[in-house]
């Protein structure tokens, strides 16, 4: 067989254009395994020897270690509350009531009472126009709407008698349109059961189902007994594997390997 017939198709081995990380061998995830020596991060699958350590120096004890303010409970407190002993306290001195502050002579202004005690001439002042005067718009003579005196519309005026002709009725006249007369189908026919005897009526209800398990159960056709291979012998079966890559890392089954 010639070397040309070894390869199938147009693919031939060639040098890759760039570096492939899988082509370089490395220890892989072996370094991520826990160590088998020492005390910290020891592999639990490995046997571990005895290890001894020295204790640490304790902190100096402080002289004052009180239980805190939670234990400062008054002595008159029992498990049901206070013991009921009367307690007294001294209040502060109340302030004196302030007396009435009588106004003195300087608080009055007698010079302003001249107009009330002595005769004085009349005095007039000009004030601004009030707001109501500006809004008071009196209607003129042309603004009144007097009712007319003709006809019976005025109550206090005498009026002559009025005669009017009524319109001609279209019903029963010679020009009545008989085509607009309603036919028999226009009226609503009353049900005969209203004024006659009505026979009995019966109806059939649906079938009532007894309460029970309503889940769907598989029938005989839902099972495949020919595919059962636990109760009888079965011929061996084989399958073809797949092509594995040479760059796949091996599976670690044991740390000792």
UniProtKB/Swiss-Prot annotation:
Which residues form the STPGR repeats? 103-129, 182-207, 218-243
Predominant place of localization: other
Where do the TM regions start and end? none
Query: What Pfam family is a match for this entry?
Result: SHIPPO-rpt
Sorted alphabetically, which InterPro entries does this protein's record hold? CIMAP (IPR051291), SHIPPO-rpt (IPR010736)
Q: Which GO terms describe its cellular component?
A: cytoskeleton; motile cilium
Keyword list (alphabetical) reads: Cell projection, Cilium, Flagellum, Repeat
| Protein origin, superkingdom | Eukaryota
Q: Where in the cell is it found?
A: Cell projection, Cilium, Flagellum
Indicate the family of this protein: Belongs to the CIMAP family.
Q: What is this protein called?
A: Ciliary microtubule associated protein 1B
Source organism (scientific name)? Danio rerio
Q: What is the lineage of its organism?
A: Eukaryota, Metazoa, Chordata, Craniata, Vertebrata
